Amino acid sequence: MKKNFFLNGLFATAMVGLTLTACSDDEQGNGAGTVGKGEYVIAASVTASGNTTNVLLTSETLNGGTVSTINNGLVNDGATQWVFYKDQYLYGLTYNQGNAGTTRSYFMNANYEVQARSGEYAVKRFTTYGIYDKYIITSSTGDGPTEYADENGYLPKMFLLSYLDVAAETYTTNNTQNKAYMSENFLGNGEFVTLAGILEHNNKIYSAAVPMGLSQYGGKANGGQWILPGNEDLVKTEDGGSNSSSYKKGELQWTQYPNECWVAIFDDETLTTKKLIKTEQISYACGRMKSQYYQTIWSADNGDIYVFSPSYAKTMSDA
């Protein structure tokens, strides 16, 4: 019974983001008073005297009342994304401005109290994440090893993966010396891609392959063969931009194919063997907030896979 309560609570919490303020025992909230500890976990931030503290609270309900931090809650460092692994653990993934971020996990004890597990990891920069088998996997696209530089010194883009083994509390990464992790020309059109979402279905991984345009490496490949006629003026002539919209001289920023949607189906967690599916009925499938690419590919109870797109093709131009 406790296991089911915990499962329901975690998934309910995953759908909402709450910022709460501490209250005293005699304060009333939403006409229902202060609720007790329970199977629901709430990632909250409490502000007092100009200082903000991150707290993992538990509650017996999400339907009303006030959740208090008095004798309730575990202070933590906060997280960019909270990921729930089945009915067992809660992971706090931290994105640290393009560098490795600290990640740790938590569990709920028999007294409805959240406790931290011992493992702590500095995972690679990530732009998407998901669960497959015994792993929480994070992914981003970044520069490959110097051994693969072209004659101009440009590095190819590669998939950068992190694997958190939930039960073993271990952390590993992929070997980018393996050319199977090359994201350049991933779709056969010369552009590099990043992945949006990691969905486990029938023991395979489904992920949207989001085309990102031509990197310096891709733009120079075979004398610029991947630059479509008429798009020569889109190639950057100098470095510019900032943060997740920055670019370098020689890049063709953003895709030349906004009217295409690609889904990659990987055989297992290594992401080294794949099948590609394409449609021109929708644009590429992801949600976007700064450097994060959010999953918009989901499975239904009957086993069907649904892919959603914000219709980027309608909003993109050559400007």
Please give the residue ranges for each predicted region.
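Surface-exposed loop and turn segments in beta-propeller and other repeat-based domains
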Residues: 174-191, 270-292, 319
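Bacterial Sec-dependent N-terminal signal peptides
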Residues: 1-8, 12-42
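Extracellular structured ligand-interaction cores
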Residues: 258-263, 292-294, 302
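Long, well-ordered mid-to-C-terminal structural blocks that present hydrophobic/aromatic surfaces
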Residues: 301-319
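Secondary-structure boundary elements
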Residues: 167-170, 198-206, 214, 264-277, ...
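Short, solvent-exposed beta-strand-terminating loops
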Residues: 207-229
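Acidic/polar, low-complexity intrinsically disordered N-terminal segments immediately downstream
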Residues: 25-186, 195-210
